[in-house]
Each structure stands twice: as C-alpha cells, then as structure tokens.
C-alpha cells in the first residue's frame, strides 16, 4: 500500500515510481491511472489523467441551465479525449456561481458567497495551462489574454508547497469528501484528478489538507481544487467514467450528477 510523508515533492515521477503506479495510454500522449491506497488512516481511491502540455489542448466548456448534463455527456458533446467536472454551481438552476470564460465569452461570475473557497483561476491560452492565485474578483484583468478561464478553489499547491500554512476550520475544508483538482508540474505535465469518497471502507474521501498532500504525492507543483462531492467525475473517451461518482450513493461508475461546466482535453 502507499504511504505518504508530508514533504515537498517535485518532478512528475518523484512521488510515483517508488509506489508502482501504472499509467495506461489513452491516446495522443495522455495517460490514465487508478490508485488504491491506505493514506491518513483511511482508504483512498484516486483516478488521474495526465498529458504533456505541448501535445494537447485544454478547454473550459460551459453549458448551464437546461443544457447542463453529466461530465461524460458534456465531454462527448464537445469532442473530448478526457474530461473532469468543473467548478461550483447552483444545484437548483444549474448555473455557475464562479467566474467562467469560454472562448473569450464571460459566462459566469463569482458570487460573494463563494469567496470563502474560490481563490484561484485555471487559465488556458493555447496549450499553456496556468493556475493563478487570485484574491480579487477582478478576474478579467488578471486573465485578459486567456480565452478559457475557470475560477475555483481553494488553491492547493503553489510552487510545490501547500498553499496555506493552516486551513480554515469550516467543514468544507476539514471533512472528508470526494474531491476534484487540476494541477501542473514544472516539467510540463498537466493532471486531472478525482479522489472518490462517501463509500466508507472503499473510498473515504479527503479533507482539503489531505487533498493537497495527495497532489504532492502525484508530483504536482501547482494545484487547484474544483467542485467535489457528488459532482466529482473523471472520464476518458476510451474507458468511459473511470472514477466512482457518488450521486447515486453507490460505489460504481454510474453515479454522475448534472453539471454546467467541465474541463476537457482534446
């Protein structure tokens, strides 16, 4: 089983090679892995996709309201090779509650209520993917040259270190939930990751601190938390849903939730 020490990890293989994690090719240089581990005195199931930044393009796709659908459906609709669910949204209206820019169109704004956890941006320009720590709602000024931008949070890692010395005591941060995050390495890899949860003894989920440590184990230098809970879903064109989304309260691949946006690669 995996063991994780709370030390800085750098380089794409630094936290992986010694544990025998196997990556499977899913096309165009992208790879997928499924990791089962005993971490933090809990059972963790981690699904990950990684790809060389120079080989593929990331996009933010936003289809809110009546157009919202499962992550897999959004991915297929937009011709994705792989996809993960996006950021926070209103469960009743299926409208985003964080800033969204898709193909230079601003399609959502961060509400004041969401600022307690939304402190970062996933910004895409061409094949370049950046994670930006941003403590202002003036996102457009910070990302005016980026056609695709998604606000989310909290930022988990910056430059290989946990983004905060101490996390807030709110249950969103301290309780174990399914988590989704996106991250980058300094040697040019981009990761999409889901930590399964709400399946005691099979997938216990992670706190935000534990999520940041898992990101470090994967060798990430920068990482941004996305929407989690029942939204957390990781999908590939070749394998379908590879995580275990929990909106059906079962530990299987069928419990997807309708979401308004997703992060795709193609």
Please tell me what each predicted stretch does.
Residues 145-169:
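Short, conserved active-site entrance elements at the starts or edges of catalytic domains
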Residues 93-116, 167-184, 189-222, 231-266:
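Conserved, well-ordered active-site substructure
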Residues 62-68, 136-141, 195-200:
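Short, solvent-exposed aromatic-acidic interface loops
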Residues 52-55, 92, 123-130, 159, ...:
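Short acidic-glycine loop/turn motifs at beta-strand connectors
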Residues 9-121, 128-131:
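Zymogen propeptides
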Residues 81-85, 122-123, 130, 183, ...:
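Structural recognition of the beta-strand scaffold that forms the well-ordered cores
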Residues 126, 133-136, 154-160, 184-186, ...:
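Short, structured patches in soluble enzyme cores that scaffold and shape functional sites
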């Amino acid at each position: 089983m995996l063991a994780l020490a709370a030390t800085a990890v750098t380089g794409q293989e630094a936290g992986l090679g010694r544990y025998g994690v196997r990556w499977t090719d899913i096309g165009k240089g992208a790879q997928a892995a499924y990791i089962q581990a005993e971490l933090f005195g809990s059972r963790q199931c981690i699904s990950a996709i990684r790809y060389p930044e120079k080989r593929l393009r990331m996009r933010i796709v936003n289809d809110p309201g009546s157009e919202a659908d499962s992550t897999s459906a959004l991915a297929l609709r937009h011709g994705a090779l792989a996809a993960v669910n996006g950021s926070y949204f209103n469960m009743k209206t299926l409208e985003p509650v964080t800033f969204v820019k898709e193909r230079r169109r601003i399609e959502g704004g961060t509400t004041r209520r969401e600022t307690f956890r939304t402190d970062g941006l996933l910004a895409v320009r061409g094949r370049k993917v950046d994670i930006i720590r941003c403590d202002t709602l003036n996102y457009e000024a910070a990302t005016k040259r980026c056609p695709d931008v998604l606000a989310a949070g909290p930022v988990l890692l910056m430059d290989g270190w946990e983004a905060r010395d101490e996390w807030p005591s709110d249950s969103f941060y301290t309780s174990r939930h399914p988590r989704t995050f996106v991250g980058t390495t300094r040697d040019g890899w981009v990761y999409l990751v889901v930590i399964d949860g709400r399946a005691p003894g099979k997938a216990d989920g992670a706190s935000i601190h534990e999520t940041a440590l898992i990101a470090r184990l994967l060798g990430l230098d920068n990482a941004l938390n996305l929407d989690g809970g029942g939204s957390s879903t990781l999908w590939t064109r070749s394998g379908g849903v590879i995580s275990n989304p929990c909106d059906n309260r079962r530990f299987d691949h069928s419990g997807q939730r309708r979401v308004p946006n997703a992060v795709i690669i193609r």
